């Protein structure tokens, strides 16, 4: 079980590493790209225990409404907002406009 969970986390981290600067993805989107659309909560947990916050940009993941995490594990909501804004992502009242900033990976 631990090995399976480890492999799941690695898939999640691989997807999150692909989110470009200036873009965000939702937990559900990361779950789908990692192989299972039902993993949205697993994505949240994996990012909460992210072993490499500098190399795995978990701050680029928001909820399905575009809301940043009120409990961002690496400095709180204001830190997540600051990191996103430093990349040019506008955050208004803790929300990102998904129509403008959501990552649309080429799935070919």
Language model region names:
Residues 2-108:
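Nucleic acid-binding interface residues in structured DNA/RNA-binding domains
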């Amino acid at each position: 079980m631990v090995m399976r969970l480890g492999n799941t986390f690695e898939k999640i981290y691989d997807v999150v590493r692909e989110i470009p600067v200036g873009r965000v993805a939702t937990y559900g989107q990361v779950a789908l790209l990692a192989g299972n659309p039902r993993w949205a909560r697993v994505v949240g947990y994996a990012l909460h225990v992210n072993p490499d916050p500098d190399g795995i940009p978990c701050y680029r993941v928001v909820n399905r409404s575009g809301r940043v995490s009120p409990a961002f594990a690496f400095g709180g909501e204001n830190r997540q907002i600051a990191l996103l804004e430093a990349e040019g992502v506008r955050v208004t009242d803790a929300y990102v406009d998904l129509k403008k900033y959501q990552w649309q990976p080429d799935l070919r």
